[in-house]
């Protein structure tokens, strides 16, 4: 495999992961859906052609996506997967051909076809025919409980019709805002001087995320059902439609209608690729006249048995496809091209545009992706460009209208210095991305590092928003992430006041007002004496806020009854809570390049100890399944940096505690062999076969170091391989790495238990269900602790449930458990059990 292929796959993963982070975690996307889909498809094609490129943490193996913190999180009983996308007829025909070959049927394939609604995916749960819960899609595995807001949507049935209603039924569908409702809402909002909704899609999503359901009730929302999740008929749970209910997708939709769910009247059943493409054409022509927004059509194999036979890939069903419409476009003028710096230093060019309406939204910025894209398009300041909101969401510059270019424009060049910190902007050979070389000395990178560190899937510091992170970094109060754990309530209050003041003069006047209004009236004359009353005209530097703080401005002990402090106290409490974490969260929070959640989880499971991981030579990381050379080298590079080790030391010194440390997995024992180490060192020409041959003949790295190629040749190793290995070992850095890796390999073998000694948890093989609200810990935290003891935590009660943990306001699950004779635990018993087995924190 060519090095260029490896590098391209690495670049694609980096760009996709960055796009996922900005879209789901930061809510600040920088590339369009169309560009994302293009990158994703290219990566899939590379991984299909070169399977050895596939890793467990590849973006192709997971569903993107993030859950907001305002609502209770709920894990879906069956994941809400996304769909593969098609953008042309060839991809649609290939989709049909794949199913045809797999099914081996001589009859034309039938497909259920429907519009791709542009709203918010939702899962509705019914128990004994009554609505009990509505959960957003979230990241596909975990969503937000928006039940009270769902209840306000009139098209959602609260009680199902008919006599054959399942005991448990999960219905998947889309909440959307009709176009006429959107228009009427904005008319009323404009008349009242209120903020307008940007588009129906944003209106639907924002309405469901209102904490006050009375606000949601005022929004014109509607719902279409298009599928099902979990079904329980009598005592049997199904993760697919049972034959007794329906044998085809279209029949299942008809049954949903009979139960009272709204199903689009545009759903049809067609045959073959010709039928699919004809439907796509018809819906595309009718699109502008529809009462709701759509961004494509969806094709699903109608036969449910065929769906089961086709199965799933990790990200999507093989039996369904989303055929998307072309993005909407408008022309405007480029007023400037600026650089944004991301967490890893990536320098992304952004076009500042003359405001233009595209698909119902005013667009002022558009991504240019990278310097190569700018060069390809030859975008210049002053150009008229075509702006596309790919997927009808994120704007990008799609093309330049060359014949409208004004005279004397100049080609754009990537700046040589970072606009934030002044460090050199560099690009590694073969890379498309330019990066600021300042690393964490660059405030922009520090800000992104902080945002990642406190995010929900990392250290989960609730309440620390993006704007306040900017204040913390700009002020110099925090230099590294460990400084978060030194913050005080007084510092936060001081920062908030300085950050919200329009000028130092306004700040000082506010200070005087606070002092004069409390028990400090005697200081008023002093303030007047030093010129506070006269402040107002003198020019001050833009850095005045940070300068005041760096100068050691004393904390103001103002009348706390007149200053809101609860937010600061809550934030400090959230920071304190985050001190107790898990190894996988801690590793993910460090922001190591290429180390996503799944890789962090694998490292935790296989090695179990931070001190071991942070001092491990990079080749040994490759013994973990699905960690390849690129990720292993990235880990090694990160831990080789003294600054990163120092940052970890600071976090531990400030009492960040990792509570799930354990010995290395015994499964590693069979992997820690000299042959594997020789292979993992990536020595040119040393293939797995040659590595095994050399390991058998020599037994250790030391035996290879000083003999040159001759002993290798005598042992039957080909001359070219022997010379390559001997030459590689002559490089001091390589020799040091090999010796260090050999020693660590031996140490690992000595510290791990034998396979038979592997500990089992007290709840191994048992299924547990949690219901209601727990006072001492969240349900997610309880779930993690129970899983650490071997339990499988399920979402519904059955005869196989070992026990049910019932918190406050436990509902139908408690009733079901009692009727089945399942053991009931209250929170006190749970906490006692966790404490007994070392899971109290």
Swiss-Prot record:
Its cofactor is Mg(2+); Mn(2+). CDD domains: BRCT_DNA_ligase_like, LIGANc. GO terms for biological process: DNA repair; DNA replication. It catalyses: NAD(+) + (deoxyribonucleotide)n-3'-hydroxyl + 5'-phospho-(deoxyribonucleotide)m = (deoxyribonucleotide)n+m + AMP + beta-nicotinamide D-nucleotide. Zn(2+) binds at residues 418, 421, 436, 442. Pfam families: BRCT, DNA_ligase_aden, DNA_ligase_OB, DNA_ligase_ZBD, HHH_2, Nlig-Ia. Its EC number is 6.5.1.2. InterPro entries: BRCT_dom, BRCT_dom_sf, DisA/LigA_HHH, DNA_ligase, DNA_ligase_AS, DNAligase_adenylation, DNAligase_N, NA-bd_OB-fold. GO terms for cellular component: cytosol. NAD(+) binds at residues 33-37, 82-83, 114, 137, 174, 300, 324. Transmembrane segments: none annotated. Coiled coil: none annotated. The active site is at residue 116. It is an enzyme of class 6 (ligase). Belongs to the NAD-dependent DNA ligase family. LigA subfamily. DNA ligase that catalyzes the formation of phosphodiester linkages between 5'-phosphoryl and 3'-hydroxyl groups in double-stranded DNA using NAD as a coenzyme and as the energy source for the reaction. It is essential for DNA replication and repair of damaged DNA. This is DNA ligase.
């Amino acid at each position: 495999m060519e090095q260029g292929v490896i590098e391209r796959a690495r670049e694609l993963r980096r760009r996709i992961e960055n796009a996922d982070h900005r879209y789901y975690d930061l809510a600040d996307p920088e590339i369009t859906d169309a560009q994302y889909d293009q990158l994703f498809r290219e990566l899939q094609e590379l991984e299909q052609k070169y399977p050895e490129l596939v890793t467990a943490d590849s973006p192709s193996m997971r569903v993107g996506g993030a859950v907001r913190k305002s609502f209770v999180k709920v894990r879906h009983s069956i994941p809400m997967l996304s769909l593969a996308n098609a953008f042309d007829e060839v991809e649609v025909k290939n989709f049909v051909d794949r199913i045809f070959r797999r099914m081996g049927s001589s009859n034309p394939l039938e497909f259920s076809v429907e519009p791709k609604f542009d709203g918010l995916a939702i899962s509705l749960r019914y128990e004994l025919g009554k609505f009990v819960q509505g959960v957003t899609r979230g990241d596909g595995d975990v969503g937000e409980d928006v039940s009270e807001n769902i209840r306000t949507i009139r098209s959602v049935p609260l009680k199902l019709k008919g006599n054959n209603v399942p005991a448990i039924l999960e219905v998947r569908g889309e909440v959307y805002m009709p176009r006429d409702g959107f228009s009427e809402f904005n008319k009323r909002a404009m008349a009242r001087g209120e903020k307008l909704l940007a588009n129906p899609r944003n209106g639907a999503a924002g309405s469901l995320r209102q904490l006050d359901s009375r606000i949601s009730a005022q929004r014109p929302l509607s719902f279409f059902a298009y599928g099902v999740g979990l079904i329980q008929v009598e005592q049997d749970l199904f993760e697919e439609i049972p034959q007794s209910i329906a044998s085809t997708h279209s029949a299942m939709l008809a049954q949903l209608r009979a139960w009272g769910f709204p199903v689009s009247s545009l759903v049809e059943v067609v045959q073959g690729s010709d039928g699919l493409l004809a439907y796509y054409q018809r819906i595309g022509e009718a699109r502008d006249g529809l009462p709701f927004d759509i961004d494509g059509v969806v094709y699903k194999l109608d036969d449910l048995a065929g769906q089961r036979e086709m199965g799933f890939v990790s990200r999507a069903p093989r039996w369904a496809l989303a055929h998307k419409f072309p993005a909407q476009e408008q022309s405007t003028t480029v007023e400037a091209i600026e650089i944004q710096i991301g967490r890893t230093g990536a320098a992304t060019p952004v076009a500042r545009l003359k405001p233009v309406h595209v698909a119902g939204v005013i667009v002022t910025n558009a991504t240019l992706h990278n310097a190569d894209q700018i060069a390809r398009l030859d975008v210049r300041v002053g150009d008229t460009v075509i702006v596309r909101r790919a997927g009808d969401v994120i704007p990008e510059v799609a093309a330049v209208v060359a014949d409208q270019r004004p005279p004397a424009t100049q080609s754009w060049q990537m700046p040589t210095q970072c606009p934030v910190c002044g460090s050199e902007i560099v690009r590694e050979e073969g890379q498309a991305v330019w990066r600021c070389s300042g690393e964490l000395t660059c405030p922009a990178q520090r800000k992104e590092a902080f945002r990642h560190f406190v995010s929900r899937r990392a250290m989960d510091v609730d309440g620390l928003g993006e704007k306040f992170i900017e204040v913390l970094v700009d002020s110099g109060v925090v230099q590294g992430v460990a400084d978060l754990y030194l913050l005080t309530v007084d510092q936060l209050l001081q920062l908030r006041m300085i950050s919200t003041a329009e000028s130092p003069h306004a700040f000082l006047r506010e200070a005087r007002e606070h002092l004069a209004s409390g028990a400090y009236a005697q200081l008023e004359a002093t303030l007047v004496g030093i010129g506070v009353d006269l402040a107002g005209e003198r020019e001050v530097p833009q850095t005045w806020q940070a300068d005041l703080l760096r100068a050691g401005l004393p904390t103001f002990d103002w009348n706390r009854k007149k200053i809101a402090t609860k937010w600061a106290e809550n934030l400090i409490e959230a920071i304190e809570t985050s001190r107790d974490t898990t190894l996988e969260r801690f590793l993910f929070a460090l922001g190591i390049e290429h180390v996503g959640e799944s890789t962090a989880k694998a490292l935790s499971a296989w090695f179990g100890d931070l001190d071991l991981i942070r001092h491990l030579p990079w080749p040994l990381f490759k013994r973990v399944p699905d960690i390849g050379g690129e990720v292993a080298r990235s880990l090694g590079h990160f831990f080789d940096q003294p600054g990163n080790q120092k940052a970890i030391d600071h976090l531990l010194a400030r009492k960040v505690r990792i509570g799930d440390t354990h010995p290395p997995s015994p499964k590693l024992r069979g992997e820690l062999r000299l042959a594997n180490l020789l292979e993992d060192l990536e020595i040119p020409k040393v293939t797995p076969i040659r590595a095994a041959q050399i390991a058998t003949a020599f037994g250790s790295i030391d035996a290879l170091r000083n003999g040159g190629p001759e002993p290798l040749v005598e042992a039957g190793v080909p001359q070219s391989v022997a010379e390559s290995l001997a030459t590689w070992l002559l490089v001091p850095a390589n020799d040091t790495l090999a010796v260090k890796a050999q020693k660590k390999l031996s140490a690992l073998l000595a510290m791990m238990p034998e396979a038979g000694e592997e500990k089992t948890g007290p709840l191994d093989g048992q299924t547990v269900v949690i219901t209601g609200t727990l006072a001492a810990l969240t349900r997610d935290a309880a779930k993690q602790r129970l899983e650490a003891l071997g339990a499988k935590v399920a979402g519904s009660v059955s005869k196989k449930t070992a026990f049910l943990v019932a918190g406050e306001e436990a509902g139908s699950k408690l009733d079901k458990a009692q009727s089945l004779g399942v053991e009931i635990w209250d929170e006190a018993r749970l906490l006692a059990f966790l404490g007994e087995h070392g899971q109290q924190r």
